[in-house]
Amino acid sequence: MAIRRIEGLLHLASEGRYAILVGRFNSFVVEHLLEGAIDTLKRHGVNEDNITVIHAPGAWELPIVAKKLATSNQFDAIIALGAVIRGSTPHFDFVAGECAKGLGVVALESSLPVINGVLTTDSIEQAIERSGTKAGNKGSEAALTAIEMVNLLKAI
């Protein structure tokens, strides 16, 4: 008997329904992440009618909105995008940590892929680099992960 392998593939994703949840705070970075995610989904065959963009105030609010989206049974995956940039107070640590933890809890409780595309950077320059310049576009990478996870969960 052979070992069975199950993988999520990056093939055309025309059937999937994707929610892109965007924190508006640091919008000068987040808008580029959103553009990258939408472009990647469309290039992989996702119809615009199967993409819904939801704007939340910031990264702190993303988990509760993700939970509402997950329980709506309208989506195959949620892509959470935002940017938390370190400042001179511990606020960064609380927001970044609780956002990541909350998104993970939503994914586990709902069995729905909730992709964490929230940047956590030490500087504005790092955030800009990760939103489409030197370090690629993390919004695009999050969309690829969402496609792969939708396909993987369907294959299991």
UniProtKB/Swiss-Prot annotation:
Native species: Acinetobacter baumannii (strain ATCC 17978 / DSM 105126 / CIP 53.77 / LMG 1025 / NCDC KC755 / 5377)
Protein name as catalogued: 6,7-dimethyl-8-ribityllumazine synthase
InterPro entries xref list: LS, LS/RS, LS/RS_sf
Gene Ontology molecular-function annotations: 6,7-dimethyl-8-ribityllumazine synthase activity
EC class name: transferase
Record key words, sorted: Riboflavin biosynthesis, Transferase
Gene Ontology CC terms, in alphabetical order: cytosol; riboflavin synthase complex
Protein residues bound to (2S)-2-hydroxy-3-oxobutyl phosphate: 88-89, 130
Active site residues according to the UniProt entry: 91
The keyword Plastid appears for this protein: no
Pfam families per the UniProt record, alphabetical: DMRL_synthase
Residues that coordinate or bind 5-amino-6-(D-ribitylamino)uracil: 25, 59-61, 83-85, 116
Upper classification of the organism: Bacteria, Pseudomonadati, Pseudomonadota, Gammaproteobacteria, Moraxellales
Purpose of the protein: Catalyzes the formation of 6,7-dimethyl-8-ribityllumazine by condensation of 5-amino-6-(D-ribitylamino)uracil with 3,4-dihydroxy-2-butanone 4-phosphate. This is the penultimate step in the biosynthesis of riboflavin.
Enzyme nomenclature, EC number: 2.5.1.78
Pathway(s) annotated for this protein in UniProt: Cofactor biosynthesis; riboflavin biosynthesis; riboflavin from 2-hydroxy-3-oxobutyl phosphate and 5-amino-6-(D-ribitylamino)uracil: step 1/2
Family under the similarity heading: Belongs to the DMRL synthase family.
Catalytic reaction annotation: (2S)-2-hydroxy-3-oxobutyl phosphate + 5-amino-6-(D-ribitylamino)uracil = 6,7-dimethyl-8-(1-D-ribityl)lumazine + phosphate + 2 H2O + H(+)
Family annotation (CDD domains): Lumazine_synthase-I (cd09209)
Quaternary structure (record): Forms an icosahedral capsid composed of 60 subunits, arranged as a dodecamer of pentamers.
GO BP term, example: riboflavin biosynthetic process
